[in-house]
Amino acid sequence: MEKDPIPQATSPLATWLSYLEHLHSKAIDLGLARVSEVAGRMAILKPAPFVFTVAGTNGKGTTCRTLESVLMAAGYKVGVYSSPHLVRYTERVRIQGAELPEAAHTASFAEIEAARGDISLSYFEFGTLSALWLFKQAQLDVVILEVGLGGRLDATNIVDADVAVV
């Protein structure tokens, strides 16, 4: 079986997402070593001066939106990473309350692809690294990360949060 060709930074988002779906042998592969290594290579382990991590069973989305709103009202430049998306992939990353264009996501995917070398990443790990890279590029004051299904081994936990909300 031939490997899918690597998309370019200018490839459509749908092409990248299809590529990411087939990149790793497991949809969920808990552990932080792989994703931490790539994040270290990209210097994105501290995406902003202040980081919140939001975890728990219920209310994560509401908590993230509330924090985002309060922090923006106080004059901070804020980024939020959440998952899963409901309609569009671009819902996963917001900066100052707005989704980013697809081209920003595909550019970040190309950066991660170049940095990862032979390290296999899951769809979620790739998406998390993408959010961190986008946040770092935006020079934010605060980042809010919503923990996904992985709990303590979730890819968002590669970032040493200043505040954890449970």
State the predicted function of each range.
Residues 7-8, 12, 26-28, 32-47, ...:
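ATP-dependent carboxylate-amine ligase catalytic core
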Residues 13-24:
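Generic N-terminal amphipathic, Lys/Arg-enriched alpha-helix
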Residues 15, 66, 130:
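Short Gly/charged-rich anion-binding patches and loops
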Residues 18, 69, 133:
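Surface-exposed charge patches
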Residues 50-54, 62-79:
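A conserved segment at the C-terminal end of the G1
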Residues 163-166:
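Conserved beta-strand/loop subsegment of P-loop NTPase cores
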